[in-house]
């Protein structure tokens, strides 16, 4: 079974990752940058989610919009993945959350 690897080469992620890796980054900034990375990665990871057309009444006219066909389940791998959970819930507020624990 071949595993697909998708490399996200984004300047905003690289910028934040540099601060996350810096030993002198204060805790509050570390958490802020980790959330920023999580938001950008979630946007990329959800790019291919299936959607369907829906009719929407705007203040001026009726038009077609797109909605997610179904909500995905967000599953962070404990403990490192918890840093990305807040960003995932911001983008997918109705998603169920599960957890996976892995021991080294």
What are these regions (language model features)?
Residues 1-104:
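PRPP-associated nucleotide enzymes
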